């Protein structure tokens, strides 16, 4: 399953919507996504992890925003 992760790059600052970024991770569960990110070199402030259904996944592909992270 593909998950969309909304995050802030600076973990010590208050989240600001305009600074929110997203990445896409393939995993089985939300817990696995969080573990992959925490085990990587990234120190992100994760705001939300969203599983993508087929329609949403297709939309992300069509807009060209979908690029899977290799964590």
UniProtKB/Swiss-Prot annotation:
Stretch forming the signal peptide: none
Name of the top EC class for this enzyme: transferase
Reactions this protein catalyses: RNA(n) + a ribonucleoside 5'-triphosphate = RNA(n+1) + diphosphate
Matching NCBIfam families: PRK13667.1
GO cellular component: DNA-directed RNA polymerase complex
Taxonomic lineage of the native organism: Bacteria, Bacillati, Bacillota, Bacilli, Bacillales
Pfam families tied to this protein: RpoY (PF07288)
Protein name (database record): DNA-directed RNA polymerase subunit epsilon
Family of the protein in this entry: Belongs to the RNA polymerase subunit epsilon family.
Record GO terms (molecular function): DNA binding; DNA-directed RNA polymerase activity
EC number: 2.7.7.6
Function of the molecule: A non-essential component of RNA polymerase (RNAP).
Oligomeric form and interacting partners: RNAP is composed of a core of 2 alpha, a beta and a beta' subunit. The core is associated with a delta subunit, and at least one of epsilon or omega. When a sigma factor is associated with the core the holoenzyme is formed, which can initiate transcription.
Gene3D superfamilies from the UniProt entry: RNAP, epsilon subunit-like
GO annotation terms (biological process): DNA-templated transcription
Keyword ATP-binding among UniProt keywords: no
């Amino acid at each position: 399953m593909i998950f969309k992760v909304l995050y802030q790059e600076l973990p010590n600052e208050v989240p600001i919507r305009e600074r929110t970024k997203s990445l896409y991770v393939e995993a089985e569960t939300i817990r696995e996504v969080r573990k992959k990110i925490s085990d990587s070199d990234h120190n992100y402030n994760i705001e939300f992890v969203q599983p993508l259904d087929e329609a949403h996944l297709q939309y992300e592909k069509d807009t060209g925003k979908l690029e899977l992270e290799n964590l």
